[in-house]
Amino acid sequence: ASTKGPSVFPLAPCSRSTSGGTAALGCLVKDYFPEPVTVSWNSGALTSGVHTFPAVLQSSGLYSLSSVVTVPSSSLGTQTYTCNVNHKPSNTKVDKRVELKTPLGDTTHTCPRCPEPKSCDTPPPCPRCPEPKSCDTPPPCPRCPEPKSCDTPPPCPRCPAPELLGGPSVFLFPPKPKDTLMISRTPEVTCVVVDVSHEDPEVQFKWYVDGVEVHNAKTKPREEQYNSTFRVVSVLTVLHQDWLNGKEYKCKVSNKALPAPIEKTISKTKGQPREPQVYTLPPSREEMTKNQVSLTCLVKGFYPSDIAVEWESSGQPENNYNTTPPMLDSDGSFFLYSKLTVDKSRWQQGNIFSCSVMHEALHNRFTQKSLSLSPELQLEESCAEAQDGELDGLWTTITIFITLFLLSVCYSATVTFFKVKWIFSSVVDLKQTIIPDYRNMIGQGA
């Protein structure tokens, strides 16, 4: 599919009277290609209570996703909530304001006026009696039929029950990448129906694999939500190889509140798989001054985006890590970063930390890269510390030298000044002594 910008639809609750004092606002982003698309609320100012679901590939080859934010119901009439969508591949930016709508149930619905009853009060005419054969008493006239009564008007058509704004919505989620890549785990495709009303709570699911109906799905008990609606989930267990081979899974949902069944289809992203490249990076020298340090795992060049990244040390899982979502690179592949935070003492003790990556394009679907404080890194850190110490000592020496130099210059200048002054004074005194007193000599001659 060629690059296509998304269509954005705001989703609002029925009314301000929601249970629990909170309300859910939604934003549906549909029909875009390729991934990724970013969704924020109020230009990123609103982050609490935001949940953005993973993108889903539709049968049309385009992606769609949704984002939900939970806000206080008291703020719906006073604050503005805007869904900001940014699709960089198509250079599309869309801002949609989510406004509270008045649901159908809050308005007055008038039944159509019943038709006037047809009048059937006049009986049909009595059939004509036969002519008498004699002058005797004629035979009685046949009894006329009873007139049909149409006085009772037909019942007024029943008014439709109020519907929840928008009706039930259906979302289809793929199995977790780790579940599809490990034989010991069970991959599942999940079909979620939300906004199911109390008036029509029954939901029917039908599942199809490559167009063939299957019957091994399990429907979980419905769960009541904070907005007084139900959430119903159906889970279909799939075979590892069926999913990896690109089989298509369809969930068909029926409910009385829907004008027609809703169908959602999902399958593994199509395209040639590309093997990820894995690189591990030690903590930076600047970070070694802190109590905790970060170990980084860069995974790049993989396709499709279904991937799982975990950390472990000495065979035991490490849980204090964060992994970014896969991001689209310029060559059409994906990349991500995973950061593990550990105590600096554990790193300096030489513990080995491993970044484990699972992807369908890898040999045995698995690879691992280890990282530890090697002797080379220890020597480098020691040399860096020694170099820092030498530089500190050198600066101290240079500072002392400059200070002494300036003092010596000042001392030399002062001594020279006094020497010149003394010599000048001596010359003046000597000159006065040598010059003869001609006045005395003239006086003596006279």
Swiss-Prot record:
Residues 6-99, 168-267, 276-372 form the Ig-like domain. Keywords: Adaptive immunity, Cell membrane, Disulfide bond, Glycoprotein, Immunity, Immunoglobulin, Immunoglobulin domain, Membrane, Repeat, Secreted, Transmembrane, Transmembrane helix. Changing residue 242 to N: In variant WIS. Changing residue 314 to N: In variant OMM. Changing residue 226 to F: In variant ZUC and WIS. Residues 99-160 are annotated as: Hinge. The chain crosses the membrane at residues 398-418. Residues 1-98 are annotated as: CH1. GO terms for molecular function: antigen binding; immunoglobulin receptor binding. One of its GO terms (cellular component) is plasma membrane. Residues 161-270 are annotated as: CH2. Residues 271-376 are annotated as: CH3. One of its GO terms (biological process) is adaptive immune response. N-linked glycans at Asn-322 are noncore fucosylated and the vast majority are diantennary species with a bisecting GlcNAc. Among them the most dominant glycans are HexNAc5Hex4, HexNAc5Hex5, and HexNAc5Hex5Sia1. Glycans are attached at residues 122, 137, 152, 227, 322. Sequence repeats lie at residues 116-130, 131-145, 146-160. SUPFAM superfamilies: Immunoglobulin (SSF48726). Pfam families: C1-set. Disulfide bonds join 27-83, 191-251, 297-355. PROSITE patterns: IG_LIKE (PS50835), IG_MHC (PS00290). Residues 1-397 are extracellular. Residues 419-446 are cytoplasmic. Immunoglobulins are composed of two identical heavy chains and two identical light chains; disulfide-linked. Constant region of immunoglobulin heavy chains. Immunoglobulins, also known as antibodies, are membrane-bound or secreted glycoproteins produced by B lymphocytes. In the recognition phase of humoral immunity, the membrane-bound immunoglobulins serve as receptors which, upon binding of a specific antigen, trigger the clonal expansion and differentiation of B lymphocytes into immunoglobulins-secreting plasma cells. Secreted immunoglobulins mediate the effector phase of humoral immunity, which results in the elimination of bound antigens. This is Immunoglobulin heavy constant gamma 3. It comes from Homo sapiens (Human). The lineage of its organism: Eukaryota, Metazoa, Chordata, Craniata, Vertebrata.
